[in-house]
Every structure is written in structure tokens, then in C-alpha cells.
């Protein structure tokens, strides 16, 4: 809760931003959030990190989303995934069967996935290296992508703990693995047939995250 208390302290300005819900042309979402919360936050130049904003004391990841919309949080090769989570080695070939050879996910992967659940979540949400996000910031837009409806801050540790209550399962399509209603992974696909289409892609639905004590500000004109 210390991180969320800090986030609450940042948001003294909810009445101050009378036009905060209006999209500003030319502004990336990260720049807009940095401007909104002030407190010396700046865009992180290291794009390899999952940290979008930092002030040297708190690190924030920003996700622009709509209600029930999936957002990519991580992607990479199966080899890369197994290199950072060695406990997945027993199912490496099965993951490659889906991602590289377009076969269906094999149910045999589930036991190993559940045994490595925390490592998978931390890999997808926090990344690696010294700089990791403390807070997930979600800006939710209307269906027309014209207006911000609200901005929400949640501690990353709470996001991870909320997802830990679920177990992995394979959807009926056999092409997507899910962990509860808001976290999935699959073969990326697309990319014009390039090799990157074989990446394993992790996604979340920010609006369906079941977290305790989020900081939510509804934005009005």
C-alpha cells in the first residue's frame, strides 16, 4: 500500500485539470500522463525497460486502453522466454510447436505453467534489469478513441497478486492460454509473415484486472 499511498499523494490535482479528458494532438500517452501527475515525472528514454515514466523515486508503466480491450505487455521468442525462466525448459518444445509450427497448444503444458506462474507474471509485467515499474497507470478511452474517461493507478505487486489466484487454462480454440479473465498469451502472428510472427505474446485486459484499492480518477470536461 505504500506505493498506492504515494500515487494518491500525486493526484492532488484532480480538480485542477478541467480539460484533462480531451486528447492533446501530438502528445504521446506517456507525455500526457507525465504532464498530468507532475512531480518531476519524465518519459524514460530506455525503451528496453517496461518503465515509461520515472522521477527517480517511482517508476510507472502506462497503458492506453478501452473497456475490455486487450493490450500487449510483452513479446519475444520462446528461446528468450525459456532463457529467463529455466523452469519452462520441460515444455519448450511444446511451446515451439504452437509458436513456430502453428500447431495447437498441448494440454501437457499446463502443469509446468502453473508451477512457474509467478515467474511468468513477473517476466511479462516487470521485465528484467534494474529498472522495473512500481505502478501500472491505465488511461481508459471511450469507444471512439476521442476522449479519456478515467485514469487509474494500481501497484504492480497488487496486479501480480490478483492474477496469482487463477490457474492457467487453454481456451477452446486451443490457440490461447489464459490466466483468469485479464491475462493471456499466444502466438503473435501477423507481421507480414516475418519471423517475429512466431513470438510468444503476452496481453492483459486492463479494465478486467481484479485489484484491491486502485486509485481511480474519473475525468470530466
Regions of interest found by a model, annotated:
Residues 1-50, 54-58, 62-221:
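Nucleic-acid endonuclease domains
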Amino acid at each position: 500500500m505504500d506505493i498506492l499511498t504515494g500515487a494518491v499523494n500525486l493526484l492532488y490535482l484532480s480538480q485542477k485539470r478541467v480539460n484533462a479528458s480531451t486528447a492533446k494532438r501530438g502528445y504521446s500517452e506517456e507525455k500526457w500522463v507525465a504532464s498530468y501527475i507532475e512531480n518531476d515525472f519524465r518519459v524514460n528514454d530506455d525503451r528496453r525497460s517496461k518503465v515509461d515514466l520515472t522521477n527517480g523515486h517511482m517508476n510507472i508503466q502506462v497503458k492506453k486502453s478501452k473497456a475490455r480491450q486487450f493490450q500487449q505487455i510483452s513479446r519475444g521468442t520462446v528461446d528468450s522466454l525459456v532463457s529467463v525462466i529455466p523452469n519452462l525448459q520441460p515444455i519448450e518444445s511444446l511451446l515451439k510447436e504452437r509458436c513456430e509450427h502453428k500447431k495447437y497448444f498441448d494440454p501437457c503444458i499446463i502443469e509446468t505453467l502453473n508451477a512457474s506462474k509467478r515467474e511468468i507474471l513477473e517476466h511479462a509485467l516487470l521485465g528484467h534489469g534494474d529498472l522495473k515499474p512500481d505502478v501500472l497507470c491505465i488511461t481508459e478511452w471511450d469507444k471512439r478513441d476521442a476522449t479519456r474517461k478515467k485514469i487509474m493507478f494500481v501497484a504492480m505487486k497488487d496486479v501480480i497478486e490478483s492474477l496469482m489466484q487463477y490457474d492457467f487454462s487453454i481456451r477452446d480454440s486451443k490457440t490461447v492460454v489464459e490466466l483468469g479473465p485479464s491475462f493471456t498469451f499466444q502466438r503473435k502472428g501477423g507481421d507480414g509473415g516475418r519471423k517475429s510472427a512466431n513470438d510468444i505474446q503476452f496481453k492483459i485486459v486492463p479494465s478486467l484486472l481484479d485489484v484491491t484499492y486502485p486509485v481511480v480518477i474519473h475525468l470530466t470536461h
